[in-house]
Every structure is written in structure tokens, then in C-alpha cells.
Amino acid sequence: MIDPNLLRNNLEETAQKLKEKRNFILDVKQLRKLEEQRKALQVKTETLQAERNLRSKAIGAAKARGENIESLLNEVDHLGIELAQAKALFDDVSAELNTILLTIPNIPADEVPQGKDDTENQEVARWGTPRTFDFEVKDHVTLGENIDGLDFSAGVKLSGARFAVMKGRIAKLHRALAQFMLDLHTEKHGYLETYVPYLVNHTTLYGTGQLPKFGEDLFHTKALEGEQPYALIPTAEVPVTNLVRDEILSVENLPLKMTAHTPCFRSEAGSYGRDTRGLIRMHQFDKVEMVQIVEPEKSMEALEELTGHAEEVLRLLNLPYRKVLLCSGDMGFGACKTYDLEVWLPAQNTYREISSCSNMWDFQARRMQARCRAKGDKKTRLVHTLNGSGLAVGRTLVAVLENYQNADGSITVPEVLRPYMDNVDTIGR
């Protein structure tokens, strides 16, 4: 969540920024009223507590002098009732303010271009030249089905729309991609590999910002009697980032760099009719996620590094891509700055998103109470959190199939993947 002090001390300015950069309308009148109530109740609570403490001390002194303390006891009891009522009201108002805070998006960094949607994103760079084919280009669905490696009918039979079954060499290529990405990030980029739960509790989802605002995007389990409800993770960002929830980290041990390969589960609410063919938009897909936990002043530098790590995957696979700086209207709820990497897909004759790398600033850390402290310093500070896809495995498979296709329908295996594929250079029927 954003810093509550922005609402307490700069309410009008913060509301204006949210309106201009996020098209988010803050109810200034309601917030001002609640904040005034909170302050008044805080003062009342502190005053009543002080008075009660004084009366309690007076009881002890009166007892020592042998005086009648009945009236003082009555006063303390009365003050206790008033104090409990004031505290209850204070908690109610604070909870109402917190509920509002949880719905407010992060404020974009100053360098983020203002815009309403993806049409106003800014291309930063391109790498690689799209291949020229001397035969009719097939899409990944046709390629995968022709070599008996992709079976969408089986996915529908087993689960429904937006599911697929991979078999044989295609399944192995998919696995090879994930292993290659993990090896690169752990052995060269310095990330710690983690294996995390695919089911998480609601506290975890609040921590990274999926709840309360985006509950419809998740697959929720039905809670068993006596157990808390769970949801399937929409990305490994959720459990991996929450590993530092309620922790005070030593500055000397930062940055923390973690990676995980997991399936991801998304309801794709609001995506009806979009990308209904193939692997581009699935309810279940694999992703290798990168997460960094850093000192506040180093997060923008870390974003460039993390994005570069995702870019290196594409370069080693020799897949043409472009790097895009998202405008304010296209960024995720909790991000303050985001780069998207878009890979070239020949069958669509366009670039499609394959990675999103974001600096979340202290937005998630405040929700999670993830802090850091320097050696010898008593004061703690909120860390900054970053995350990025390194990469979406299914979409990378799509890009490999389409960019490495041959006229006979076979697929040339990228050189860096051959050690994971029994050193074969081509897969086909």
C-alpha cells in the first residue's frame, strides 16, 4: 500500500497524482473525515489513558495514607469503560482507513510516461532481426500438433478451454526451457533457487497485492472444516516475495535474489474471446520468476539489472524482442515502474509480451512489514521489492517453435537447449 502519511500530510496532491497518472479517483472528502475522526479518537484515547494512570497512582498513594479510595476506584472504572469505547471506535475508523488504503494503486515514478493504455507505452530498445522465411509460416498450434506434441483436445477433455497437454519432444523442450532459465539465473545471475507452495493463504495474497482488489482473477479452494481458505498462485512472485514478510533483514545481506519455477493459475477474468487459440493465454502455465529484495535507494538500479537478466534469456535463445517502458495507465496495481519484454512471433507478425519486470517500491513491503536495518542502527526501514518473469515458459516455447520452424514442419533446437535435449539438433515426427 502507499504511505499513509501521503494521505495525512499531502492528501490533495496525492489525489491529483492518482487521478492524472492512474485515472484513480480518491474520495478526498471521505478520507479527510475519517482522518479527522482517527486523530480525535487517538487524542481522546491517549488523554483517557493518561487520566486513568494518574487515578491509579492516586489510589496507591491514598491507600498508603489510610484514606477512603472508593470514589477513586469508581473514577478508574468509569475511565476504563470510556477508554475501551474510545479504543474500539479508534480501531473501527483505522480499519476503515486501512480498507481504503488497500484499494489504492501505487503512484508511478516520475520518469514513467503518462498514458491511458498500452497504445501509449514507449519502446526503449530492440534486439535481433526477425527471420525472413522462404516458405509459408505456420503457427505454434499447427507445428505442435503436426509433430504430435501439443494436444488441445485432450486439454479440453481433461479440464476445459484454455488448457493443453504436451507430449514427447515438445514436453521435453518445455522442460528444457525451464531448466535452462533456472540454470542461467542461479549459476550466472546469482539467484537462490526456491521451491514454494502452489497454494497460499489470504494473508500472503494481501502481502503482494492480489487481495482484496483482484480476487476474481484467482482460483480459490473451498475451505475444509476447520481450515483456512487457499488460492492457487497466479505467479511465483506471491510466495517468493512473502518469504520476507514480517522479517527484519540485515542491510549487509541485501540484495536478496530468489528465483522459482512454478505453474501459475489465472482465471483470465475479463479476457473472454482474447487469444483463444494456442498457448498464449492459459488458465495454467509455467513461469520462471525472479524476485529481488533491496535497499530503498538501490531499487531503480536493481530494476535495470533484473530486466537485463530476463533479456539475456532471449538473447541466448536468439529470439528477437523489444523492450517497452509501460505508461502509467498500463502498469500493474502495485508497480511504480515496469518494463515489458515482447518477443517476435512470426505467425502473428508482431511482438507479444513474454516478460514483465517491475519495481514495486515499498508498496508490497508496507503490506508485508518487510524491513531492513543496518548494523548498529536501531531504526528499521521498509525494503523495496522487485519481480520479473525470466521467462514465461509457455510463451517462450511458442516463440521457439515459430522462430525455429523449418519448411518440413520440424523444429531446429536452439544451441543453448541441446544439452537439455540429448544433444539433438532437430525435433519432428
From Swiss-Prot:
It is found in: Cytoplasm. Coiled coil: none annotated. PANTHER family: SERINE--TRNA LIGASE, SERYL-TRNA SYNTHETASE. Its main location: cytoplasm. Catalyzes the attachment of serine to tRNA(Ser). Is also able to aminoacylate tRNA(Sec) with serine, to form the misacylated tRNA L-seryl-tRNA(Sec), which will be further converted into selenocysteinyl-tRNA(Sec). GO terms for molecular function: ATP binding; serine-tRNA ligase activity. Pathway: Aminoacyl-tRNA biosynthesis; selenocysteinyl-tRNA(Sec) biosynthesis; L-seryl-tRNA(Sec) from L-serine and tRNA(Sec): step 1/1. The lineage of its organism: Bacteria, Pseudomonadati, Pseudomonadota, Gammaproteobacteria, Pasteurellales. This is Serine--tRNA ligase. It comes from Actinobacillus succinogenes (strain ATCC 55618 / DSM 22257 / CCUG 43843 / 130Z). It is an enzyme of class 6 (ligase). It catalyses: tRNA(Ser) + L-serine + ATP = L-seryl-tRNA(Ser) + AMP + diphosphate + H(+); tRNA(Sec) + L-serine + ATP = L-seryl-tRNA(Sec) + AMP + diphosphate + H(+). Belongs to the class-II aminoacyl-tRNA synthetase family. Type-1 seryl-tRNA synthetase subfamily. Consists of two distinct domains, a catalytic core and a N-terminal extension that is involved in tRNA binding. PROSITE patterns: AA_TRNA_LIGASE_II (PS50862). GO terms for cellular component: cytoplasm. It holds the Pfam family tRNA-synt_2b. Homodimer. The tRNA molecule binds across the dimer. ATP binds at residues 266-268, 353-356. L-serine binds at residues 235-237, 289, 389. InterPro entries: aa-tRNA-synt_IIb, aa-tRNA-synth_II, aa-tRNA-synth_II/BPL/LPL, Ser-tRNA-ligase_type_1, Ser-tRNA-synth_1_N, SerRS_1_N_sf, SerRS_core, tRNA-bd_arm. Its EC number is 6.1.1.11. It comes from the Bacteria.
